[in-house]
Amino acid sequence: VFIDVSCSVSKECWAPCKAAVGTDRGKCMGKKCRCYX
């Protein structure tokens, strides 16, 4: 799932992903965070 968090590196997504989907597995794709669920 993409969340509305801009990023330049994947580690910037880990905390927002943890908050959004309950897991810190995420990647930065196209300047946006993608969380896996």
Swiss-Prot record:
The keyword Endoplasmic reticulum appears for this protein: no
Places the protein is found: Secreted
Transmembrane segments: none
Gene3D superfamilies: Knottin, scorpion toxin-like
GO molecular function, one term: ion channel inhibitor activity
Keyword annotations: Calcium-activated potassium channel impairing toxin, Disulfide bond, Ion channel impairing toxin, Neurotoxin, Potassium channel impairing toxin, Secreted, Toxin
SS bond list: C7-C28, C13-C33, C17-C35
PROSITE patterns the record matches: SCORP_SHORT_TOXIN
GO CC, one annotated term: extracellular region
Main location: secreted
InterPro entries: Scorpion_toxin-like_sf (IPR036574), Scorpion_toxinS_K_inh (IPR001947)
Expressing tissues: Expressed by the venom gland.
Superkingdom of the organism of origin: Eukaryota
Function of the molecule: Blocks selectively the high conductance calcium-activated (maxi-K) potassium channels.
Family of this protein: Belongs to the short scorpion toxin superfamily. Potassium channel inhibitor family. Alpha-KTx 01 subfamily.
Protein name: Potassium channel toxin alpha-KTx 1.4
Organism: Centruroides limbatus
